[in-house]
Amino acid sequence: IGRPQWDPIYEMIDAPPLSNTPAPRQGLPGPLQQTPDLDAWIRINADETITVFTGKVEIGQGIKTAVAQLAAEELDVALSRIRVVAVDTELSPDEGTTAGSMSVENSGSSVRQAAAEARHHLLNLAHEELEAECTPGALAVEDGLITDLLSGRQTSYWTLFGGQRFGRPITGTVHPKRFDAHNLVGQAAKRLDL
């Protein structure tokens, strides 16, 4: 007695990748390879705050505080100016699972790179706006206030850019600050999740 032969319900086929799935970008940390859009990570708000987006869930590990510190450090703003939006499927980048103590390593390195590139772009805009006598990298930034130390002229992130979109990819060509230049990272901060 043989077994009855059934027609398969599903058939496996090789489907082409979805057209909106970006190819990974080499040289970028973790999740930035799949989501290299700067606007997916950082927003300069007109109300003089900065929104940072993460795809990691706050489950007591302090990820909101850590990414806020990293962003504030790279952008040279007070920690109190940073707003963290975590795991909003409409807004946040898809960073996969929150597990294995990898949130700061993955999301943190991505936010750090995104913030460094946002700062670089803002300093280039300020250099033009101020008709600065120094290079963009020599402009001083303190809590979002940008100063050309040679002329004394000033502007801020919010005057330059508040409410706008970057409309550019993260390239990986901008280097974040050296660790010995950090003032916020590695220091105690009030937890944002408590």
Identify the residue ranges that each predicted region occupies.
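Cofactor-binding beta-sheet edge motifs in enzyme active sites
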Residues: 1-194
